[in-house]
């Protein structure tokens, strides 16, 4: 038989089984013994002359001071920056700052904690969560009640050690009233600061920096100026335009009583004419002539048009008559040709005999009679040699 298959185990089952050992390394470290370590605070101190002494000045000193065990805070927070205690004020308001409060704490709970002598309680509340932010201010009646409340610092309140200190007074931001006054400077400007190079102070041969404004080799030096007005302001010129004194054109005395100075000025500086000395021209007569010419032309055009129309109408009936006569002549010629073709065969022999016996007078008479007979029947005889 083959080897047995090993059973599979999930990761959670492996981690949860204590037979394989502890998986939390922090628990192993907590079991090891540890020596207490002293916490120290550092202070940085710089000599006042190190900023202007150059490279030869001693550098700043770094001191490490071991904090005494009495200055350590209670509650496992360790030692931190020790702020100077604010003295108890001698005048009201006597306000204490209370910190490290529970977020579920109310003003009534805080009043019960301090007891009597409390005038007002103000908890700082978060506007989003509408819960306490963990600190507040309590105002007392006298300085003695405030000092008694400071003795309660470190006491347990709802599972937290309370931290009580004297509240700092409100800072007064006194600003100048700039809405009133005449905005006039009282006195000269303060002296200007010496100009500095964009690369900082210059270094001399002695190894120290010097101010470039104090260098005697500098060419440009700024002298202090005092912006003080010497005397009153000049009067302002009127912004209004002078009014024009117009005189009537019909006054004849203006030209006669003209002063010689005025004549000299006008003669020396003649006025410019924008039209170049041109005079107005009367164009009415020219326009009338042009209109008459145009009327004559239109009349002549109308006459020629009417004559052309009359000629075209008179030519049409004569042409129609000529066409009709041409058609009738052609028809009569065809008919005569047919008749002549039939009669030539029958009377060829008789015609020759009659022609020999007939005289010229007798030949004309039957011809006329034959023509009249044909006209009565509606036929006309046309000779063979006629061409159309």
Curated annotation (Swiss-Prot):
- Show the ranges annotated as biased composition (Polar residues): 38-50, 248-257
Give me the ranges of the annotated region Disordered: 18-84, 171-388
Q: Where in the cell is it found?
A: Cytoplasm
Task: Report the GO molecular function annotations.
Answer: ribosomal small subunit binding; RNA binding; RNA strand annealing activity; RNA strand-exchange activity; translation initiation factor activity
What are the residue boundaries of the RRM domain, all occurrences included? 94-169
Low complexity bias: where? Answer: 258-268
Gene Ontology CC terms, in alphabetical order: cytoplasm; cytosol; nucleolus
Q: Which Gene3D superfamilies match?
A: 3.30.70.330
Would I find Hydrolase among this entry's keywords?
Answer: no
Quote the biased-composition stretches of kind Basic and acidic residues, using this chain's numbering: 171-185, 208-229, 289-349
Keywords of this entry: Cytoplasm, Phosphoprotein, RNA-binding
Q: Which residues carry this modification: Phosphoserine?
A: 49-50, 60, 64, 67, 71, 197, 250-252, 347
Residues found modified as Phosphothreonine = 61
Primary location: cytoplasm
Q: Which GO terms describe its biological process?
A: cytoplasmic translational initiation; eukaryotic translation initiation factor 4F complex assembly; formation of translation preinitiation complex
What is the name of the protein in this document? Probable RNA-binding protein sce3
**What is this protein's gene name?**
sce3
